[in-house]
Design a protein with these regions (language model features):
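Charge-rich, low-complexity linker and terminal segments
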Residues: 1-21, 87, 94-181
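Short cysteine-rich clusters marking metal-coordination/redox-active sites
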Residues: 75
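Hydrophobic alpha-helical segments of small multi-pass membrane proteins
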Residues: 69, 89-92
Length: 181
């Protein structure tokens, strides 16, 4: 079993790495992920990656491992930055055609290898994009907007504000019509 640390290769042959049961471990700067960058506050930081290539008991070339990162996102509730921790598990089976995907064990997600060598950062970036929340938000207890969202409305202050300005409610006529029926 070969083991490469720190510097991950740009291109890989996933089938060869699986046959040799290789382990790739290292970091990748966030700035290298072009599709991920637009959803991030900034592209500083690194992604930690551990990938274990193998051929399973059924002869399926596969990779398992983890991707860890701290991604700076914009909370859609308060529009402030928050750090979103990602620890994404990977369990992919390398396939050459969509037909092969039908016979895979359920524990694997199929990954169609259309070109060989494969760009490793594309695989990592795909997994990171899948790990992102649909609507990024702080936890309610940490979000500054929560005090406005959960604030109970004081109905008496609204009525007194209308009376102070001397404005008549335009829907009060409808209330009178309802009473006549």
């Amino acid at each position: 079993m070969s083991n490469q640390r720190q510097r991950l290769p740009h291109e890989i042959d996933p089938f060869r790495l699986s046959e040799s049961r290789s382990v790739l471990e290292g970091t990748v700067p966030l700035k290298q992920f072009k599709r991920l960058r637009p959803v991030l506050v900034d592209d500083t930081g690194v992604i930690a990656v551990v990938l274990n290539f193998d051929v399973d008991e059924l002869g399926v070339p596969c990779v398992t491992g983890t991707i860890k990162a701290e991604l700076g996102l914009i909370c859609q509730r308060c529009l402030e930055r928050y750090d979103y921790p990602v620890e994404q598990g990977i369990s992919l089976a390398w396939i050459r055609s969509e037909r092969e995907a039908k016979n895979l064990p359920l524990r694997y997600e199929p990954y169609l290898v259309e070109t060989n060598p494969l760009i490793l950062n594309d695989v990592i970036e795909d997994e990171l994009l899948l790990a992102l929340p649909q609507i990024p938000m702080h936890q309610e207890s940490e979000c500054v907007a929560t005090k406005w969202i959960n604030k109970p409305e004081d109905k008496s202050s609204e009525k007194s504000a209308d009376n102070e300005t001397g404005k008549e409610n335009p829907f009060s006529v409808l209330a009178n019509l309802k009473r006549k029926d």
